[in-house]
Amino acid sequence: MIELFFEYIFPLIIIALKVVAITIPLILCVAYLTYAERRVIGLMQLRRGPNVVGPFGLLQPIADAVKLLFKEPIIPTNADKILFVLAPMITFILSLIGWAVIPFAKGVVLADINVGVLYILAISSLSVYGIIIAGWASNSKYAFLGAIRSSAQMISYEVSMGLVIITVLLTTGTLNLSQIVEAQRTMPWWIDLMLMPMGVVFFISVLAETNRLPFDLPEAESELVAGYNVEYSSMGFALFFLGEYANMILVSAMTTTFFLGGYLPPFNISWLDCIPGFFWFVFKVGFLLFCFLWIRATLPRYRYDQLMRLGWKVFLPLTLFWVVLVSSVLIYTDHLPNV
């Protein structure tokens, strides 16, 4: 009986504890990211932001959570009730399970699988289904139009994202995210320089993937009232809200892993190695999240034709050209990784 416990049950308990250890801090980070967003945008607009609930407004996310929890969940009469309830759950769950393959520090990763890049691409592609289901199940023209916009936007920018990731795979020679980070430790500086434009393209693409300004057309308030979640209230709205911000943190972690060295120090200086890798990872992700908030506070929304033109006529040809360029340079300089 004891052997059965240690062989089958104990590993499941360890996995459950690891999942809880990632999920709870992540939900707290999402809650306080909303607070940080309101404070940062307030400062940029020369106002205070939330500062009443608790010292410096630090209890504002808890007040918002309690408010949403006790609101009445309203389901439209003609809505598909089962899908209407499932849609926000799908969005929120998919935003969490992508973290399984993200390396927080050396050896600190929930599932260190050899196809981590394919896993993360699959999860990011599936995340749009929650929005599409919400738009269709709501039986509202505004919600449905927001869902259609979201699917078109995802298709347009997922292609460019995939090609950008191919350039990273060409230089590192692996689909394992931990190995991608370690490969950047010894990567020549000129390869890093060559990947910089693709890092910018990737970051702009994930802005579109997460429906953030200037690409928030699926929930454009001035056109679609609130877009795909116009009919949601209470915890349904809260789960969409949490899913959006959890996706922001996830794509920032992906950008950090692919282009900023993950948990590695920013410079190859010996004394920087004394600082734990987790600190560098959090610092880089925090910087990218600040860029998300900065962009929201300063840039206007794109028109829909501008959004499509940027994805298909600018990013797609540019990333295709860069894949050929990186391949040619690596072959010419004999720097193709030994796979």
From Swiss-Prot:
Family: Belongs to the complex I subunit 1 family.
Entry's Gene Ontology cellular component terms: plasma membrane
Organism: Rickettsia bellii (strain RML369-C)
Protein name: NADH-quinone oxidoreductase subunit H
Catalytic reaction annotation: a quinone + NADH + 5 H(+)(in) = a quinol + NAD(+) + 4 H(+)(out)
Major localisation: membrane
Residues annotated as transmembrane: 9-29, 50-70, 82-102, 115-135, 161-181, 187-207, 235-255, 275-295, 311-331
Keywords recorded for this protein, A-Z: Cell inner membrane, Cell membrane, Membrane, NAD, Quinone, Translocase, Transmembrane, Transmembrane helix, Ubiquinone
Keyword Cell wall biogenesis/degradation on entry: no
EC number: 7.1.1.-
InterPro entries the record matches: NADH_UbQ_OxRdtase_su1/FPO (IPR001694), NADH_UbQ_OxRdtase_su1_CS (IPR018086)
